């Protein structure tokens, strides 16, 4: 995984609420003395014994949004929970949806030519079908662009 990809994953994790937890009584109880942890958005402590620095901890513990379907799903849910985030994300992936819709319209045109195939014809190009076809990397890249755009917009408005 490239440094740019990993940095994007860490940026998204921080935006979603992942936080650094320094060694202390709470971390010692779960993992032992001197262990650095991250707290995920659900409040669970996450650690790895392979981390030699705080930066290394972020590299090893945060979700790999570019690769994991489960991380993609959590990211989509988090984006959808806020109207501004979702709108910014939607604006980023709109061009991808147009390509997806054009592809399915071509398939529909083929089915239209064959009367016997009408029963299995796609009636609607659904938004949910589109989201499922996006790769984790496409979602992560679009989410990062959307969130950075929102951050820049907020900076201009203050």
Summary of predicted features, one role per range:
Residues 1-158:
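Glycine-rich anion-binding surface patch
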